[in-house]
Each structure stands twice: as structure tokens, then as C-alpha cells.
Amino acid sequence: MEAKFFCFLEIIGVGYKASTNAQGSILYLKLGFSHEIRLQVTPSVRVFCLKPNLICCTGMDHQKVTQFAAIVKSCKPPEVYKGKGIQYRNEIIHKKQGKKK
């Protein structure tokens, strides 16, 4: 049995979505920008969307899987005030407190 490595990414935010094409070679991200972000998936990594806000990256090489997940996360890192953006599934985001009057 071959060991596979998984990396789950959650997209948090109203209207933020992810999808792939039929072959799974291109990842489409709608992250609140005026355009859709297209990411070419590396051949050694397989990407699929379990839900519109949950991305699963899998592959045989742990370094390549986590590197691609980091590239996806860098498209929209989590905000420090509201927490919107892309984050790892078990990641804890420390939010800042807003202004006080």
C-alpha cells in the first residue's frame, strides 16, 4: 500500500469559491477580486474540491503537496480582523481586536 499525503484548505468568506476543471489540472478560485484566479496544478499533485469552500491537495511527495497548498493559500491569506481568506483546515487564526471608542 502506498502512502499518500493530504492537505486540506478551507475558504472562509461570503462568495469565496473554488472549483477545478474536468481533468483536475486547473484550480479556479473566486476570492472577491474582479477576476477569477487560475492556478496550474503540478503533475505530481492531485487537487479536487469536496465542497465549494473546501480544497483537498493530495500526492505522493509531501514537500510538493504542501508547497502547492502554500501557493494556493498565498492567493488570499486570512485577514487579521475578520478571518476571511484561505487557511489550512486545523489552523488557528488569532484575530486582532478592533478600535475602541
Curated annotation (Swiss-Prot):
GO biological process: translation
One family name in Pfam for this protein: Ribosomal_L6
Mitochondrion as UniProt keyword: yes
InterPro entries, per the entry: Ribosomal_uL6-like, Ribosomal_uL6-like_a/b-dom_sf, Ribosomal_uL6_a/b-dom, Ribosomal_uL6_bac-type, Ribosomal_uL6_CS
Gene3D superfamilies: Ribosomal protein L6, alpha-beta domain
Gene Ontology molecular function: rRNA binding; structural constituent of ribosome
GO cellular component, one term: ribosome
Keywords, alphabetical: Mitochondrion, Ribonucleoprotein, Ribosomal protein
Intracellular or extracellular location(s): Mitochondrion
Main location group: mitochondrion
Similarity comment: family membership: Belongs to the universal ribosomal protein uL6 family.
UniProt name for this protein: Large ribosomal subunit protein uL6m
Organism: Marchantia polymorpha (Common liverwort)
